[in-house]
Amino acid sequence: MLDLKQIRENPDYIQELLNRRSASNEYDLTPILDRDRQQRDIEATRTQLQARSNEIGKLIGQKMKSGINPQSEEIQALKTEGNDLKTQLSELEPQEKQLKSEIEALLLQLPNLPSESTPLGKSEADNVEVRRWGDEYLPKIEVLPHWEIAERLGILEVERAVKIAQSRFIALVGAGAALERALINFMLDCQINAGYLEVIPPVLINSDSLQGTGQLPKFAEESFKCSEDDLWLAPTAEVPVTNLYRDEIVEAEQLPIKHCAYTPCFRREAGSYGKDTRGLIRLHQFNKVELVKLVHPETSEAEHQSLVNNAEAILQALKLPYRVLELCTGDLGFGATKCYDLEVWLPSSGTYREISSCSNCGDFQARRANIRLKEKGKKGTQYVHTLNGSGLAVGRTMAAILENYQQSNGTVKVPDVLQPYLKREIL
């Protein structure tokens, strides 16, 4: 959530940053500023009325103490004025409460501000390529799409999964299930060795958690909700792991806090009709290892780069060709102030596809979730910065392996680093 004080003091600058996100200028600060002025006017009036009410209470006490008859005209007039003030105050209170509620609702609809260093752009076409890695590992043969080789190997069940659930669900069997499990364990082991503390969080989460990380209220239609409880299926482990610290104050000496977590993830994929209808790229349920950091604002940028490196390390260990993109303002995620996407090479389509999105959210999520830090010897608290990224999306990693490691005889070589997990060299 954005800082209302910052909006109030620098409305033109904040509006300009929001406009960088949207060519249609869909984010208008005017309704917030109007309500903020009304609320502050009411607050000022209420303060004056309360001061006068307190003054009258003291006057009545002083006069009665001095021996003036409580039924005297003077005291009765003061009591009448005091009652009138209480009536006015009682009428102002719900007005102010309503305005505060409306301001908060409007603030929750606003995305994070792009950093000054985020490239300007309108869409993904304007994202900036930072680097490529692994050209020497590009396949030398023509390969089949990952879903076709998986079905030929008998490791992927689509029709039976659809029978159980609906479209965009799959079942992995035999070596496919083993490869998925091996990838999860390998990814977790790598990140634990990099200093992340593993968490197994709930995957059913409440609305406060989704609001804290920015999925609610704006993106409710993209998540699955339980019909009888205030519980949602987690779209990413970023949500429950970040919310472990909701409404808490951490000591500065504890930072950075670094967690990795494997969870199944659930997304309705609203608006993706007709896209990636086959294979492992776009599913309603998929597995992912997530990286989450809570960091000091002063180290935020360096910690972000480190998180990107941690995600890249998985692709490098697997020897999968990829590229790193810095997202432009028009393609930036709702909660991010700066973001790098890792895209892995899928040779069957001749394209790079996103496999990790590494975001620096600044204090945006921390303000929504009320996660603060306290420094020794300093008064007050400040909001932490939160970072998150996939380390990695497991299904998409499997898709990349099935394509990049295909052999001319129709088998798939197991990457060297996964062979100790799978106890085999060939699928």
Swiss-Prot record:
Source species of the chain: Rippkaea orientalis (strain PCC 8801 / RF-1)
- InterPro entries reported for this sequence: aa-tRNA-synt_IIb (IPR002314), aa-tRNA-synth_II (IPR006195), aa-tRNA-synth_II/BPL/LPL (IPR045864), Ser-tRNA-ligase_type_1 (IPR002317), Ser-tRNA-synth_1_N (IPR015866), SerRS_1_N_sf (IPR042103), SerRS_core (IPR033729), tRNA-bd_arm (IPR010978)
Q: Which PROSITE patterns did the record assign?
A: AA_TRNA_LIGASE_II
Q: Which NCBIfam families match?
A: serS
The domain section of the record reads: Consists of two distinct domains, a catalytic core and a N-terminal extension that is involved in tRNA binding.
Q: Which residues form the signal peptide?
A: none
User: What's its catalytic activity?
Assistant: tRNA(Ser) + L-serine + ATP = L-seryl-tRNA(Ser) + AMP + diphosphate + H(+); tRNA(Sec) + L-serine + ATP = L-seryl-tRNA(Sec) + AMP + diphosphate + H(+)
Q: Which residues bind L-serine?
A: 236-238, 290, 390
The protein in question is named Serine--tRNA ligase
Q: Which Pfam families match?
A: Seryl_tRNA_N (PF02403), tRNA-synt_2b (PF00587)
Q: Does the keyword DNA damage apply?
A: no
Q: Which family does it belong to?
A: Belongs to the class-II aminoacyl-tRNA synthetase family. Type-1 seryl-tRNA synthetase subfamily.
Give a GO molecular function annotation for the protein. ATP binding
Q: Where in the cell is it found?
A: Cytoplasm
GO terms under biological process: selenocysteine biosynthetic process; seryl-tRNA aminoacylation
Job of this protein: Catalyzes the attachment of serine to tRNA(Ser). Is also able to aminoacylate tRNA(Sec) with serine, to form the misacylated tRNA L-seryl-tRNA(Sec), which will be further converted into selenocysteinyl-tRNA(Sec).
**Pathway this chain belongs to:** Aminoacyl-tRNA biosynthesis; selenocysteinyl-tRNA(Sec) biosynthesis; L-seryl-tRNA(Sec) from L-serine and tRNA(Sec): step 1/1
Query: Which class of enzymes does this protein belong to?
Result: ligase
- The EC number of this protein is 6.1.1.11
The record's HAMAP family line, in alphabetical order, gives: Ser_tRNA_synth_type1
Q: Which UniProt keywords apply?
A: Aminoacyl-tRNA synthetase, ATP-binding, Cytoplasm, Ligase, Nucleotide-binding, Protein biosynthesis
Subunit structure of this chain's protein: Homodimer. The tRNA molecule binds across the dimer.
Q: Name one GO cellular component term.
A: cytoplasm
